[in-house]
């Protein structure tokens, strides 16, 4: 396994660890999710380029589209929670349930 793949997997693991450890603020959770999506995008792109599997070349683009939608929804939720409660604590999201 090359050093590039090891670095990308390490970046994914660090982002996942950050998501599991720093769950108190919504902004830090969103940043960790974006790090995970970026490392998945780079890993998928490199695997498709190295395997010369051109039929799956749209898969990283679709992953990037879903990452952009996730970021937009996350930021809108962050703005709504911070305007309503004044903080971006994840514990405030339990108050949004009906």
From Swiss-Prot:
Keywords: Electron transport, Membrane, Mitochondrion, Mitochondrion inner membrane, NAD, Respiratory chain, Translocase, Transmembrane, Transmembrane helix, Transport, Ubiquinone
Membrane topology qualifier: Multi-pass membrane protein
Keyword Cell wall biogenesis/degradation applies: no
Leader peptide range in chain numbering: none
Domain of life: Eukaryota
Location in or out of the cell: Mitochondrion inner membrane
Uppermost EC category: translocase
Keyword Ribonucleoprotein applies: no
InterPro entries hit by this protein: NADH_UbQ_OxRdtase_chain4L/K, NUOK/Mnh_C1-like
Spans through the membrane: 1-21, 29-49, 61-81
Molecular function, one GO term: NADH dehydrogenase (ubiquinone) activity
EC number, as in UniProt: 7.1.1.2
Primary location recorded for the protein, binned into one broad class: mitochondrion
Catalytic activity line of the entry: a ubiquinone + NADH + 5 H(+)(in) = a ubiquinol + NAD(+) + 4 H(+)(out)
GO BP term (any one): ATP synthesis coupled electron transport
Pfam families, per database record: Oxidored_q2
GO CC field: mitochondrial inner membrane; respiratory chain complex I
Family: Belongs to the complex I subunit 4L family.
Function, in words: Core subunit of the mitochondrial membrane respiratory chain NADH dehydrogenase (Complex I) which catalyzes electron transfer from NADH through the respiratory chain, using ubiquinone as an electron acceptor. Part of the enzyme membrane arm which is embedded in the lipid bilayer and involved in proton translocation.
Subunit and interaction comment: Core subunit of respiratory chain NADH dehydrogenase (Complex I) which is composed of 45 different subunits.
Name under which the protein is recorded: NADH-ubiquinone oxidoreductase chain 4L
Species of origin: Capra hircus
Designated gene of the protein: MT-ND4L
